[in-house]
Amino acid sequence: MMGCSFGAAHDAFAEEAAKTPAEAEDSQRTAQENADSEYHLPDLTVLGDRKTFRGGMIERKSATGILGGKDSLELPFSVTTVSQKAIETFSTPQSGVMDTLSLVPSVRASSSKSVHSVTIRGFQQNGYSMYINGIPGAMSSGNLPYYWIENATVVAGPNLGVNGTNISDTIGGSINFQSKRAQAKDNTDVRLSYNGGRSFEQGVDVSRRFGADKAFGLRVAANHIGGETVQEDKELKQDNIFVNFDHQGKRSTTNLMLGYSRIKYEGGGDGFSVGNLTVLPKAPDASKSYTPSWLYHTYKDTWIILNHEQKLNDHVTAYINFGHHKFDYDKYYEGTPKLTSNDGDFTINAEYWPLGHTRIYFGTGLRGDFQTGDVKHEYIIGFDKNWVNRFSGGGNLWSGTGNLYRNNSWASVPLPDYQPPLQFKQQMTGYHLVDTMKFMDDRLQLTLGLHGHKSSYTRVGQKRQDSDATCPTFALSYKFTPEVMGYVSHSESFNAGTLVSGASYKNKGEVLPPAKTKQDELGVKIKKGDFVNTLSLFKIRKANTIDVMRPDGKYRLNDGEQENTGFEWAFTGKIGKRLDLVGGMMYLDAKQSKTKDGANDGKAVGGTSKFSGTIGAVYHVDPAWSLIGRVSYLGRADIKNETLSVPASWKVDLGASYETKMGTTPVTLTLMCYNVTGKDYWIPVAGADSLQLSAPRSVSFAANFEL
């Protein structure tokens, strides 16, 4: 684990002034407990200058889109900010930071070693729809490591009304990654690790504060990964560097992040599509490869992200956000096997399909407060704009056959040299209006919001297509006691409108109105003693495009629907004096409705498990030794309109960390074993008739030096 997360772990500055009476009472109780044991941390632990709940895994303050930093216990949404400590403890060499996000019960991470992909409440998301420092669509599609990330905030459910306008869909929720900034204590950390197979990693994390009152900060995080992974014939080469410069003034804050990443995977991907089978073949050996070793794909990303806030007076703050993200599939060359028989036969088609995009985002607005009588108002007025140019093109290059249970070999083919042409240009302009009204000494809060945007889409060789829509946000919360808050909310999201393509449709070339997703949620947040629990009920209705027959022919329309209904329980805290816990569970009932001719109405959405959950634990044996464990469960799921069933699966990760010194240099040694049982299993992909193969058992060892 990174030593920098422990540098300020017991620094108790600046908490008392902000405490509620209940928190002050907790603090007095904690002080007595600390007198009895050095392991019992204060109610809000400061890790790297950031306050967390007991156990240090979840941060109390969440950066929630345009709302800014808010106490997560007061927000009328399901919001979780995973801390740097949790990210460093539970990220994996195979899936990076995505595996940490599965500590949030609404999130399920895929096992892909190459692609940022998760589901939130049953809806797929990739890097195109994720945020960095509040900038929409800025995350890479490639699987980046955690080294540069300070925290990750997950807002479950559609929430376009409180986030920056995003061209990519954020149906199930939003994920925002915050880059590391220089903290109060300077650090120089060097990390050396063995990631399994023949893969090794070297990293450095350096931060300094300087200038009058340490107002300026600089942080550089860089790493290199190279070597064959735990899967045979698959190799990963990765180079990343992120530079973060910030200024903290008396009336302004500025943050500038610059980033570069290049990731090359050799050996193809991990996914399988499913053909017309009557029985799902048993999962094969996950340590083997089922794609040609000469397949490869390369991701290259560059970022410039600027955030600035200026306090105009005691009640009004102006903000500006800017982002530039250039992304390239550097000669993308990939194939996905398709299962064609019950005996494990498959076909594979490899495509040479390079693509890339350039995204530019600009947002500005005012955030402030005022009072009308006894009612306090906190408002947001914001405007933003997205520009995207996408380049794409290529074609089918090679096809072959194989089997899951025998050794496969495919002769290599020459690679073409091809530059993808411009595919389309898109612009999206949006506005945000939010007013949070506080009554009864802030115990009762009402949030009203309205978001609208207009999209302009121009495909090469076609005329421009425009679409627009608005969506409201309503939320009501009541604090029954200082420790118990209940809320109800309604939120929405919508896409930019779908272009109808295909010669068989009578409305070919038409851009359909934006398809809306609507969520109703009821929840309660309870902070009692050493634990925080969040319970929530939700229903999400998503419009789908389906084929509709009319007297004059076939049309593609937004007349279909998917309905996801569920329950979540999330928790974080401590048991006794040494055991930190974080995790939760979700029940999800995802059904198809309003399908074509009603053929699949009431059937389960492919790949969605009814039950899933994760528990992460750290047991502090003594001040030097800690034991680490995580157990994940994914329930049975149906695919192919309930004609095939994917069995339930368990995954267990175990490890230990040891803090010591080499001379005067603090060193943290971490040993982890992932998928301890070594079980091979299929992982269903929510909303699709496809599968991921589990990651094989692997061992990693890391040493972090605090120089």
State where each predicted segment sits:
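Face-selective signature of the C-terminal outer-membrane beta-barrel domain
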Residues: 304-327, 348-461, 535
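Surface-exposed loop/turn segments flanking beta-strands in extracellular/periplasmic regions
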Residues: 273-288, 339-346, 392-422, 506-510, ...
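C-terminal beta-signal and adjacent terminal beta-strands/loops
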Residues: 581, 624, 636-638, 658-707
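Acidic, small-polar-rich N-terminal luminal/periplasmic segments of exported/outer-membrane proteins
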Residues: 40-185, 522
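Gram-negative outer-membrane beta-barrel transporters
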Residues: 539, 558-641, 677-680, 704-706
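Transmembrane beta-barrel wall of Gram-negative outer-membrane proteins
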Residues: 187-189, 194-268, 294-311, 362
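Membrane-embedded beta-barrel scaffold of Gram-negative outer-membrane proteins
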Residues: 307-323, 327-333, 486, 513-594, ...
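Structural signature of Gram-negative outer-membrane beta-barrels, strongest in the C-terminal barrel
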Residues: 357, 376-388, 422-542, 572-574, ...
